[in-house]
Amino acid sequence: MGYFDRLRALSADRNTLLCVGLDPDPERIPGGAAGALRHCREVVRQTEEHVCCYKPNSAFWEQYGPDGWHALLELRDEAPQTPFLFDGKRGDMGNTMRAYALTVFATLAMDAATVNPYLGADSIEEFTRYEDRGVYVVCRSSNPGAASLQHLDVKGRPLYMHVAELAQGLNTHQNVGLVVGATAPAEIAEVRRSSQLPFLIPGIGAQEGDLEGSVRAAWNGDPASCLMSASRSVLFADKPSREAAKLKDGINAVVGALR
């Protein structure tokens, strides 16, 4: 079963569209890589029933050196039934991307990954050739400076709309999605009008993205269409299980009103 089918099945089974980011901060979590593993392992144990995916950002594990990679692999084993989405936003020449894809999908055994489209379609194809893995192309990101590049006018349309079109053309194996941030619900709606690809929507927690507006803009009836992601707001909550349940219920309430 491919990544997106697994995501749909788990979403239905757990009644959730929530993804939780696992991004340890050494300034808030003592003990190096071992401390990060302990903290994130507890978060996984508390939240797994409320999520359909976990999203470790590679930089937060790379900062610990080799111990960080080992810790991430151990964390992956903590929740084998839940997909892990490797948020590395890799983007490079084809041969390099081939090595990145091998690292992410074979060595680390991740179920999905984010990629950067700046080098064009041929670089992304090194990831999409793994037919049973998901590949989310960064389209309209959630950071404040995104518009300076992603909103550039290209032949009468913003650049992010061209990225959405490029991603659609790469979806031969039905394993491609888009990253569109919850801080830009109007842009999510614009992309959704032209594309029915699955969306990964980060930014509903500490970044204070628009949860309701984003779900309304993205939802198309497909459970994979609207994977809502929060990281710090859950990871550093006094009780991660309660925060995850709150987010899950909030998302479900919006979806319920749309059905």
Show where each model-derived region lies.
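Conserved, mostly hydrophobic/aromatic
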Residues: V20, Y54, D87, A113, ...
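Conserved N-terminal beta1-alpha1 strand-loop-helix module at the mouth
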Residues: M1-P83, K155, S241-R259
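Short, well-ordered coil/turn segments that N-cap beta-strands
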Residues: R14-L18, E49-C52, P80-P83, D111, ...
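Active-site-adjacent beta->alpha loops and helix N-cap segments on the catalytic face
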Residues: Q63-E78, M93-M97, P117-D132, T183-R193, ...
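Acidic (Asp/Glu)-rich catalytic clusters
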Residues: S11-D13, V44-H50, L73-P80, E126-E131, ...
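Conserved anion-binding
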Residues: P24-E27, D92-V179
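A C-terminal functional module that forms or caps the active site or interfaces directly
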Residues: L178, A182-S229
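C-terminal helical cap(s) of enzyme catalytic domains, especially alpha/beta-barrels
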Residues: G213-S225, V234-R259
